[in-house]
C-alpha cells in the first residue's frame, strides 16, 4: 500500500484507470454526529426513537474462525497497538485492523484490483485482549462436545478476564463499564489519510473498525470498517454510484481518496458514547438494538477510554456466566422456544426476527459484494438451488481480493470463493479448516452462544437438517435447508428484554436507522 506523498502514486493510478476503462460486465445495476448518553433513560429514548418500519433484514458482521478449545480465551475488539503505527494513524487508548499495499503498475492487458496488500498482518478493531478478530480455525471437537444444556465452560486464561471473574457481582446489570475497559491503547486514524492507508491500519492491528477523527481529541467521530471498504471497491469498479461526483471521479481516476469521505457514503448509526461509571444494563440496551459498538468515555465525557462491541459483551457474559444470576434458565432454552432468529416459512416473521438474505452458489462473487452493499448487511448465506446452506461470505472477506492477482475471483462463483477461503485457512493453520456457522431450531441458547464465541462470528445460520440427520447432531459438517439466522443483536436484545428494565428493546431499531429496513 502506498502512504501519503509516495512517489509511486502516478504509476499505480494509471493501472487503476486502465482497469476502469474495461470494467467487468457482471450485470450489476448502478446504484452523524453521535449524541452523548450518560443516562439510561435518555439512551433508551434515543435508540427507540429510530424504530419505524416492520420490514425485516438480516443482521451481519464478519464471520471469523477462532479456536474453540477454550471458550474463555480471546482478544478484545481493538487490536493491540504496536510499534510502527502507519502514517496517518495515531494511538489514544484502543481499536481494529488488516493491510493494503500499493497497487502494482502493470500492463493494460491485466485487470487490477483497487486495493492490494503487500504483507500479512494481524489485527481487528478496537481492543487487544478479550475481543481479537484474528481468523483462526475452530476446533470442531471442542464445539461438538459442548452439552446443549450446560453453562459450564473453561474460564478465560487471560489475566484480564481472570481479574473480572474475581470482582463482578452476581448481578451483571450493575457492573460499571469501567470494569470492561482494558488500559490498552485505542488506535484512531485521521480522516485525511487514504482508504489504502486506513485498510493497512486495519490489517496491521487485526481490527474490524477504526474511529476516524476530523480533529485531535475528536470524540464525535464515525468509524471506518469493511463495509466502507466494500463500498469503495464497488465504486472503483463502477458498480455503484454515489451522490458525490468528486469522490466518484477520484475513485475512477485511481487517485487517493480520503477515508473521511468514504465513510460518509455508507449509512451508519450514531457513535454512541457512555461514561465509564454507567452500568452494563444500559450498554446491553443499546447493543441489543442493533448498534455494533459503543464508546466508553471518562466521567467528564471528554476522552474515549475504550470501546465495547457486541462480540466483546457476549464473550464477557459467556466467560463469566456462572457468576451471574438467572442465566441458566435462558441458556437451556432452544432458539425455537425463545422465538429469536427462527423463521417459520408458513408464518409471517415477527418484528424481532432477522430476515435471511442469501445468494446462489453459482452466482458471481461480485454480485454477493453488491448484494451486501445494497442490503446494507455484512454477511450473506450461500445456498444451492434446493435452498441448502453451502457456506457464508462476509464483508471482511473483501481482504482476500485486494491483490491484483486475486481480482479474477470477482468474476468467479461464490462457491469457488468459499473453497479459496477454506484452502487459505488450511494453509495458514496447517490443517483443514471448516468452521461450523450453523445451528438448528432446537439448539440451545448456550450452544449457540458457545459457537458464536468459538467462531468469532456475528451471526449463525439456522438450518433444518435433512431427514437422515439427527436434529441434535452438531458433529456433522453438513448443514441442511436454510430457514433462518440468529445474530449477536438477537441474543443481546433477548437478554435486555428478559433481564433489564428495558423491556421494549427492538433488535431492528439500528437497522431501520441505517436504512437497512424500509
UniProtKB/Swiss-Prot annotation:
Residues 1-14, 23-54, 97-110 have a biased composition (Low complexity). GO terms for molecular function: protein serine/threonine phosphatase inhibitor activity. Keywords: CBS domain, Cytoplasm, Nucleus, Repeat. One of its GO terms (biological process) is cellular response to glucose starvation. PROSITE patterns: CBS. It is found in: Cytoplasm; Nucleus. It comes from the Eukaryota. InterPro entries: AMPK_gamma/SDS23_families, CBS_dom, CBS_dom_sf, Ssd23. Residues 181-242, 265-323, 350-409, 429-501 form the CBS domain. Pfam families: CBS. Residues 1-54, 77-140 are annotated as: Disordered. The keyword Nucleus applies. One of its GO terms (cellular component) is nucleus. Its main location: cytoplasm. PANTHER family: AMP-ACTIVATED PROTEIN KINASE, GAMMA REGULATORY SUBUNIT, CBS DOMAIN-CONTAINING PROTEIN. Involved in DNA replication and cell separation. Belongs to the SDS23 family. This is Protein SDS23.
